[in-house]
Amino acid sequence: MLRNTEYKQVIIVRTDIKMSKGKLAVQVAHAAVSAAFEAYKKKREWFLEWWATGQKKIVVKGGSERDLLKYAEMAKKKDLPVAIIRDAGLTELPPNTLTAVGIGPGPSRKIDEITGDLKLL
């Protein structure tokens, strides 16, 4: 484990589409679980340290689909776990609508380089 390193997960949500509070909550949950599973598979040390230190999560406003895809690509280039969430389209949104991106868990400083300027939801 990397001592003296803080770990977190950031969920970036679309702000250019209308979602009910319940739909938004479920999309954030999908992103958090999916990104954590990616970390567990590919960055086990990061996942375990994050898990042992309280699983810090932050939800931020991300803008459009294009914006979210840009953040996801930046995270992949930094070798961070990423989950891109697309809705099934069974209730409020058309099928395959991108709703959220989960980044991390990973070192906070690496994630902040991508999401540090985004506003909290």
From Swiss-Prot:
Catalysed conversion reaction: an N-acyl-L-alpha-aminoacyl-tRNA + H2O = an N-acyl-L-amino acid + a tRNA + H(+)
Entry's localization field: Cytoplasm
EC number(s) stated in the UniProt entry for this protein: 3.1.1.29
GO CC annotation terms, alphabetical: cytosol
Top-level taxon: Archaea
GO process annotations (BP): translation
GO molecular-function term, one example from the UniProt record: peptidyl-tRNA hydrolase activity
Pfam families: PTH2
Gene3D superfamilies: Bit1
Transmembrane segments: none
CDD domains named in the record: PTH2
Function text: The natural substrate for this enzyme may be peptidyl-tRNAs which drop off the ribosome during protein synthesis.
The name this protein goes by in its record: Peptidyl-tRNA hydrolase
Organism: Staphylothermus marinus (strain ATCC 43588 / DSM 3639 / JCM 9404 / F1)
Gene this protein is translated from: pth
